[in-house]
Amino acid sequence: MKPLIHFAHANGVPSKVYQKLFDQLKDQYDIIYVAEIGTDKRYPITHGWTYLVDQIIDSIVQQSQGRKVIGLGHSLGSVLTLMAAYRRPELFSQVIMLDPPFIIGKASFAFHLA
């Protein structure tokens, strides 16, 4: 059985846009994904992204058939995936974050002031 990837896309870039990436991975991995983050009224966009994290978790639970996933996310999707893994670690074998929007070090102080 191939490892299972759950993919979460970047802000405003639906998962289908990543089809060429999925095509490159499909020989070695099974791939599931959340189609569109932030457009489903059951998962409103709120401070702290709580409901968007719920959307990631629900997507995994509904599609994984009980298998642990490699959580793969791009930008916003990577942060939501990390938050989902923190909340429900039993769903994940690992997390891979592509281009996470983290600002660390001295520069982060200026963003906290903004």
Where are these regions (language model features)?
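Active-site acidic short loop of glycosyltransferases
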Residues: 1-2, 27, 65-67, 90
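Conserved HGGG/HGGXW glycine-rich cap/lid loop of the alpha/beta-hydrolase fold
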Residues: 2-42
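Conserved catalytic-core motifs of eukaryotic protein kinase domains, centered on the activation segment
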Residues: 18-19, 42-47, 106-109
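Active-site signature of alpha/beta-hydrolase-fold catalytic machinery across serine-
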Residues: 20, 83-87
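Active-site loop/oxyanion-hole signature of alpha/beta-hydrolase fold enzymes
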Residues: 33-72
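Residue in the alpha/beta-hydrolase core beta-strand immediately N-terminal to the catalytic nucleophile
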Residues: 70, 93-96
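Gly/Ala-rich beta-loop-alpha elbow adjacent to hydrolase catalytic centers
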Residues: 73-77, 81
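Flexible "cap/lid" loop of the alpha/beta hydrolase fold
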Residues: 86, 95-114
